[in-house]
């Protein structure tokens, strides 16, 4: 049974996510137009939540064009936010993904190798911020955790 407080919290989380995704999309659309990306600025985050916040605009810049403004997926790319995002096994129609996503490290390795498929690539720090943003958007609790690094990603289990 869901309480009114639970419903209010769920609505607040959805509204917060929507505002973050809209801000990220606005940033991304402002930079759409071809050409090389601006030089990669380092992502200086003191914890994983701050890193996720820095990842929002980067999602808009590097991911929203294919995966949709809210990460909902498009005819070009699957959803990366929501109930069908980050499944354990690749979809049968997957163009690039052939591996399972057990941990955040699996996701990072795939994304860093294949995404985006065209155009400029994010820096390693930017990939980590985008990953933190995606994990947080999918309900993975990052509160109190240090910034994501290649060394601590295996500790974040997505599918046991």
Spans of model-derived segments:
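Flexible coil segments in periplasmic/lumen-exposed cytochrome c-class electron-transfer proteins
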Residues: 122-160
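Electrostatic cytochrome c docking/interface patches
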Residues: 30-58, 74
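Bacterial N-terminal signal peptides that target proteins for export
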Residues: 4-17
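An amphipathic alpha-helix signature
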Residues: 101-112, 124, 128-132
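C-terminal motif of bacterial Sec signal peptides marking the signal peptidase cleavage site
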Residues: 25-28
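The canonical Cys-X-X-Cys-His
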Residues: 55, 59-70, 130, 134
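Gly/Gly-Pro-rich "capping" loops immediately C-terminal to redox-active cysteine motifs
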Residues: 72-107
């Amino acid at each position: 049974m869901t309480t009114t407080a639970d419903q209010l919290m769920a609505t607040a989380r959805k509204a917060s996510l929507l505002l973050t995704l809209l801000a990220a999309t606005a940033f991304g659309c402002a930079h759409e137009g071809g050409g090389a990306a601006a030089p990669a600025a380092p992502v200086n985050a003191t914890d994983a939540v701050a890193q996720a916040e820095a990842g929002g605009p980067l999602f808009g810049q590097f991911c929203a064009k294919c995966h949709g403004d809210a990460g909902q997926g498009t005819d070009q790319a699957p959803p990366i936010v929501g109930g069908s995002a980050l499944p354990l096994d690749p979809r049968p129609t997957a163009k690039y993904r052939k591996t399972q996503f057990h941990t955040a490290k699996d996701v990072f390795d795939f994304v860093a190798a294949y995404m985006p498929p065209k155009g400029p690539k994010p820096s390693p720090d930017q990939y980590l911020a985008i990953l933190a943003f995606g994990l947080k958007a999918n309900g993975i609790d990052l509160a109190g955790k240090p910034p994501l690094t290649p060394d601590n990603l295996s500790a974040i289990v997505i599918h046991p």
